[in-house]
Amino acid sequence: MTTFNNDMTLSELAPGEFGIVKEFTDLEMSVKLMEMGCLPGESVTVSRVAPLGDPIAINVSGYQLSLRKFEASTIILQ
């Protein structure tokens, strides 16, 4: 597994890579994501990416979620 220190979005990670949620770029989307357990400070791991890149399966807070690429692009990681 690889971890990143530079800020990047969740949509940029490949399967097996992980990061820590830092912030969100879309206020409306951030509410939805936080309700699903994707909170700042939480570790997020990409488990799978569909062949065309959409959706992206992630593990966060002990749950597996599927996000659209747009949704994943609103999550900034550290």
Language-model segment annotations:
Residues 1-78:
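Compact, glycine-rich, soluble single-domain proteins
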